[in-house]
A protein has these predicted regions:
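Short, functionally critical alpha-helical segments immediately adjacent to catalytic or ligand/cofactor-binding
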Residues: 1-17, 24, 45-46, 66-72, ...
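Glycine-rich phosphate-binding loop at the start of an alpha helix
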Residues: 3, 18, 35, 39
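Secondary-structure boundary/capping residues
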Residues: 18-19, 149
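Short, solvent-exposed loop/turn and secondary-structure capping segments
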Residues: 19-22, 80-82
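Short linear capping/connector segments at secondary-structure termini
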Residues: 22-30
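Non-catalytic cell-wall polysaccharide-engagement segments
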Residues: 32-43, 47, 51-153
Length: 153
């Protein structure tokens, strides 16, 4: 369900440990952690996700592109539409390197290692500094899968 997707995103973002549980401040105010109320964070996060999902349908891309765009920004949806219509780690990596990181000052392609199991599995954990999280949609997928397993126990 969509509630499960939002819960998986909250777990991916903050594990529910901060007031801005969906890390949605930046989309609202342009400043990280400026939302200090969990309900407002969820309202804003769901608003962004809903807009992304509508844009994904309009551009005929897969829904995981909309989830990845939650991390990268809505223009990622256009990028995927122009490059095959399906979110992949490879596409996310190219977008991170060529669009996100340079727009935030990383013009040298500097990377760092992100020690997270999904990241290590898909790409050795490499992320571009200031480039967002190329593994975001995959992490949400894994968390959604685990939630479904544990709900059956």
């Amino acid at each position: 369900t969509s509630v499960d997707l939002v819960l998986a995103m909250i777990y991916t973002e903050t594990k529910g440990k901060t007031d801005d549980v969906m890390q949605s401040s930046e989309s609202s105010t342009g400043v990280t952690n400026s939302i200090t109320d969990q309900k407002e964070s969820i309202r804003q996060g769901v608003r962004v996700l809903s807009d992304n999902l509508e844009a994904a349908v309009h551009h005929k891309v897969d829904p995981w592109t909309a989830v990845q765009a939650y991390n990268f920004g809505k223009t990622y949806i256009d990028y995927v539409a122009d490059n095959g219509g399906v979110n992949t780690v490879e596409l996310a990596n190219a977008y991170s390197k060529d669009v996100v990181a340079p727009s935030l000052g990383n013009t040298s392609g500097k990377t760092y290692t992100y020690y997270q199991p999904v990241a290590m599995y898909y790409g050795g954990g490499k992320l571009y500094t200031n480039g967002g999280n190329i593994y975001y949609a995959k992490e949400v997928q894994l968390n959604l899968f685990l939630m479904r397993i544990f709900s059956r126990l």
